C-alpha cells in the first residue's frame, strides 16, 4: 500500500536532517514504519491476504536492515529515532 503524497511529504519534513533530505536512514525508516503500520491494520481485517503479508515481511526486513545500519553508524541517532517512532527494539 503506497502512501499518499501529502502524508509522505509530512513524514519527510518531520524526520529530515536537512532541507531536501529524502534519503537519510531516519526518513527511510519513518516512511517504512508508516507503511508497516498501514499494512498491519489491513491484515487485522483481511487475515488470509498472504500476498500482503509477504510484502509486510519484506518491509519489516528492510526496516530492520536500515536500523542495524543506523545503530552501527551513530548509536545516538538510532536511539533517538526508535524513541520518536515508538519502535520497541
UniProtKB/Swiss-Prot annotation:
Keywords: Ribonucleoprotein, Ribosomal protein, RNA-binding, rRNA-binding. GO terms for molecular function: rRNA binding; structural constituent of ribosome. GO terms for cellular component: cytosolic small ribosomal subunit. InterPro entries: Ribosomal_uS15 (IPR000589), Ribosomal_uS15_bac-type (IPR005290), uS15_NS1_RNA-bd_sf (IPR009068). Belongs to the universal ribosomal protein uS15 family. One of the primary rRNA binding proteins, it binds directly to 16S rRNA where it helps nucleate assembly of the platform of the 30S subunit by binding and bridging several RNA helices of the 16S rRNA. NCBIfam families: S15_bact. This is Small ribosomal subunit protein uS15.
Amino acid at each position: 500500500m503506497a502512501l499518499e503524497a501529502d502524508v509522505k511529504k509530512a513524514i519527510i519534513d518531520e524526520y529530515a536532517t536537512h532541507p531536501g533530505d529524502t534519503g537519510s536512514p531516519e526518513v527511510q525508516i519513518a516512511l517504512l514504519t508508516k507503511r508497516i503500520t498501514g499494512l498491519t491494520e489491513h491484515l487485522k481485517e483481511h487475515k488470509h491476504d498472504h500476498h500482503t503479508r509477504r510484502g509486510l515481511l519484506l518491509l519489516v526486513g528492510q526496516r530492520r536492515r536500515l536500523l542495524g545500519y543506523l545503530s552501527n553508524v551513530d548509536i545516538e541517532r538510532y536511539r533517538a529515532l526508535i524513541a520518536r517512532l515508538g519502535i520497541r527494539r
